[in-house]
Amino acid sequence: MSRTAAPPSDDPHIPVLLRPLLAAVAPVSGIWLDGTFGAGGYTRGLLAAGADRVIAVDRDPLAFELAAGWAKDYGDRLVMQQGVFSRMDEYASDLDGVVLDLGVSSMQLDLAERGFSFMKDGPLDMRMSQEGPSAADLVNTATEADLADILFHYGEERASRRIARAIVKARAEAPIETTLQLAALVESCLPRPKPGQSHPATRSFQALRIAVNAEYDELFEGLMAAERALKPGGKLAVVTFHSIEDRMVKRFLQARAGRSGRANRYAPETVEDAPQFELLSRKAIGPDDQELAENPRARSAKLRVALRTDAPAGAVDAKSIGMPQLKGGTR
């Protein structure tokens, strides 16, 4: 396949912000890592734009099974790696670019049996890798206080205590096992949404999915891994879909670009102060009217892009970049 050829027209997934992403990181060449392969939209876009090779990472083995039909067309230009993007520096080094799309794959949302959607009935699962405790395990065993904490900090759900109380009361009668069962329970705790507002269960499902898959830990570790894996001049592009993860990415890049400030601005810059990234866009890039018309899913998406400098990789405190802190403990 030609390096400049457009992605195949039968692509079932519309990658969010692909056009502005490719424009922001142009020219595309060398070795890139797509840390959230999903349906392969970004990978195909990068290969079509001129990447010599893309290392595609996904924790869900089904993603690679579904891509097998078209992936072979790219030969050794496409390398598939089952795993998590927080370990990308174990899979590759001296990368020319890293792309992370933090949204849920449309493939996973479309499969009722994966348990991500409150619009389709299925087992209350939500595991991206299909390993470890499921959302049903969490909902049916966590304490009321822990459930409220997760819903509030991970989903920014103001009615977290009310919903947690309802969950504990309901599961005392019978286990909560399906997506629609949980969605109906959440709906019963909240006012009916006005036209144009999101489904009442949106925030609760987001919070539980994040908890089940340790998504904030994965994002924090992934940003640090990208810093280690990128070569000087390498580009990092991250697409976020809600305020908490965007805040984490924004603060991380600001801190690593030296915008968190030195103790004394007149003091000489030290090796420790040297920025690891240069911001390629001061503000997040959002969808234009054309993309919103083509793909309503893009309405909340934000893209942030940065360039890796030659400063040594370092460490960052998770709390300092706005990672939610649960009372019971993660980071």
From Swiss-Prot:
Known EC number: 2.1.1.199
Coiled-coil region(s): none
Cytoplasm recorded as keyword: yes
Signal peptide: none
GO CC, alphabetical: cytoplasm
Catalyzed reaction equations: cytidine(1402) in 16S rRNA + S-adenosyl-L-methionine = N(4)-methylcytidine(1402) in 16S rRNA + S-adenosyl-L-homocysteine + H(+)
Enzyme class: transferase
Superkingdom of source: Bacteria
Keyword Repressor set for record: no
MF GO annotations: rRNA (cytosine-N4-)-methyltransferase activity
GO BP terms in the entry: rRNA base methylation
Subcellular location: Cytoplasm
Gene3D superfamilies linked to this entry: Putative methyltransferase TM0872, insert domain (1.10.150.170), Vaccinia Virus protein VP39 (3.40.50.150)
Chain positions recorded as S-adenosyl-L-methionine binding sites: G40, G41, Y42, D58, F85, D101, Q108
This protein's UniProt keywords: Cytoplasm, Methyltransferase, rRNA processing, S-adenosyl-L-methionine, Transferase
InterPro entries recorded: RsmH, SAM-dep_MeTrfase_MraW_recog, SAM-dependent_MTases_sf
Job of this protein: Specifically methylates the N4 position of cytidine in position 1402 (C1402) of 16S rRNA.
PANTHER family tied to this protein: 12S RRNA N4-METHYLCYTIDINE METHYLTRANSFERASE, S-ADENOSYL-METHYLTRANSFERASE MRAW
Recorded family membership: Belongs to the methyltransferase superfamily. RsmH family.
NCBIfam families, per database record: 16S rRNA (cytosine(1402)-N(4))-methyltransferase RsmH
Full protein name: Ribosomal RNA small subunit methyltransferase H
Lineage: Bacteria, Pseudomonadati, Pseudomonadota, Alphaproteobacteria, Rhodobacterales
